[in-house]
Amino acid sequence: VEVIERRTNKLVGRFLHEHGLSIVVPEDQRIKHDILIPPSDTNGAQHGQVVAVEIMAQPTRHTQPLGRVAEVLGEIDDPGMEIEIAVRKFDVPVEFSEAARKQAARLPDVVRKSDLKDRVDLRDVPLITIDGEDARDFDDAVYCEAVELGTGQRKRPGWRLLVAIADVSNYVRPGDALDDDAIERGTSVYFPRRVIPMLPESLSNGLCSLNPDVDRLVLVCDMVIPATGAKAGTVTAYQFYNAVMHSHARTTYTNIWAALQQLSLIHI
């Protein structure tokens, strides 16, 4: 029996220089071997620093694994070091492929007139985004208004609710470079004080983010909800359509809750 292929060929750990030898102690406690670093492969790492290591020779029954320091991340107590360790420990993709970067660079900075074809114009509807205080990208927006449902004696109060999500599909098509990178990532990864986006920043924080006071392409679910009767609070009719919107405000959960509790007045 022999090992055909090993999954781990890169890892993060502490660089130690003791008794004339340089080793890296892996951050991942499931890895029981320390990595021996030849003098020519330390990359200037100092004792105690956190480093990223590339495994050059896997361990055998009689020898330790050999590696080279590919990157010196810094001191263990540097601000944000826990994030740098997590990114490498879990192999979170940080850099986009060259093809994806080139494709993103070719996209426009703003919504063009040609993009509006076959879209409902909702730019006058006061849609708003509601997110956390530290959010940088805004994926969805909402608008709700009181309406009268039915006619004549069958009139009853209700609500019209619009939920709009950024129409990423207008810019990212199946099988293109941006799509390939997005599939590899699967999702944006959120750390305290840092986000590793699924798409390049020009899209994640730009064209595909419903920023205030700019036009954005969206997919909308337009719903009708009775306020009274047996179906009160239930969606009784809905339709989906492509639209263009213009966010009227970037709000947060905190100030919306405060407004609902009438603790403060905010302009929306």
Task: Enumerate the language-model features and the residues they cover.
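Conserved, carboxylate-rich catalytic/transport cores that coordinate ions
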Residues: 6-265
